[in-house]
A protein has these predicted regions:
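Conserved HGGG/HGGXW glycine-rich cap/lid loop of the alpha/beta-hydrolase fold
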Residues: 7-64
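Short beta-strand/loop motif that positions the catalytic acidic residue
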Residues: 209, 215-217
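Conserved alpha/beta-hydrolase "acid-adjacent" motif
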Residues: 222-228
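Flexible "cap/lid" loop of the alpha/beta hydrolase fold
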Residues: 103, 107, 114-144, 189
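Conserved alpha/beta-hydrolase catalytic His-Asp/Glu region
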Residues: 148-198, 205
Length: 267
């Protein structure tokens, strides 16, 4: 890991893959996701790409800023990172909340992006928002688990999971992570991130994106419904929309998804 000192915090970041100016990609992780937690996805990307990824503010080693962040702050952090790395133009990959930050970055700095991949995400505003995860924080554990299950995949129930062992493994992993004890600072950071997330809205600015754009979604996503990806597609000229068999984690559920994303980013 390396660090970058910003005015209000120290940003922790890491590089993966073989350095290659033609295959640079800036990766934005999802809600609550750190570099460490996202290594399976990052490592797969790094097999083909020159990856830069950071623990976004409020998460992981980067820690908490002194004030509540905005989506613009998350995009500004990324700009500071690529400027620090000396990257002029590069591809961007954003998944879930990371797709929201990627959109904010793309509408603010469209000239920097060569290709944009947006997975299981939403534009906000009139285009549709993802499930309000901040509302789950204070629910009883059983109710939070029930809603989180359907948010992952609207098909998930006991009968479905009994017949789909891979999906059962996904759910077991989600439940195991939910039992891990967190510090007061970690919990506060997650709340701060989700509070920024609830105000995400790039709907009226999506027309600023002109680079080749792939929008990918799962047909059974309860967090970021496929209709939200269709809305993004309608606002970005020349964009490509691909739908997959799966939910919020379709990139793991549908074997076609990851090769399609890699093919797009390396195209």
């Amino acid at each position: 890991m390396a660090t970058l000192d910003l005015p209000d915090l120290t940003l922790w970041y890491e590089r993966f893959g073989t350095p290659d100016p033609a295959r640079r990609v800036l990766v934005f992780n999802g809600s609550g996701a750190t570099i460490e937690a996202s290594r399976p996805l990052i490592d797969k990307l790094a097999e083909h790409l020159d990856v830069a990824v950071h623990d976004q503010r409020c998460l992981g080693r980067t820690g908490l800023p002194p004030t509540q962040p905005t989506m613009a702050d998350y995009a500004a952090d990324a700009l500071a990172l690529v400027d620090h790395l000396g990257w002029d133009r590069f591809a961007v990959f954003g998944i879930s909340f990371g797709g929201m930050v990627a959109q904010e970055f793309a509408v603010t700095h469209p000239e920097r992006i060569t290709r944009l991949a947006l997975l299981c995400t939403s534009p906000g505003g009139a285009g549709g928002s993802s499930y309000p995860l901040h509302e789950l924080l204070d629910l009883p554990p059983d109710e939070r688990d029930r809603i989180s299950l359907r948010n992952l995949d609207t098909r998930y129930d006991d009968a479905f999971l009994a017949d789909h062992p891979f999906d059962r493994m996904i759910v077991d992993g989600m439940r195991a992570r939910a039992t891990v004890a967190k510090s007061a600072e970690q919990l506060r950071g997650e709340r701060m991130q989700l509070d920024a997330r609830r105000h995400h809205d790039v709907w009226d600015r999506l027309g600023a994106i002109t680079c080749p754009t792939l929008i990918a979604c799962g047909d059974h996503d309860g967090t970021a419904p496929a209709a939200n990806s269709e809305a993004i597609h309608s606002r970005i000229a020349g964009s490509e929309l691909r739908r997959y068999e799966g939910g919020h984690l379709f990139v793991y559920q549908d074997r076609r998804a990851f090769p399609d994303v890699i093919g797009f980013l390396t195209g």
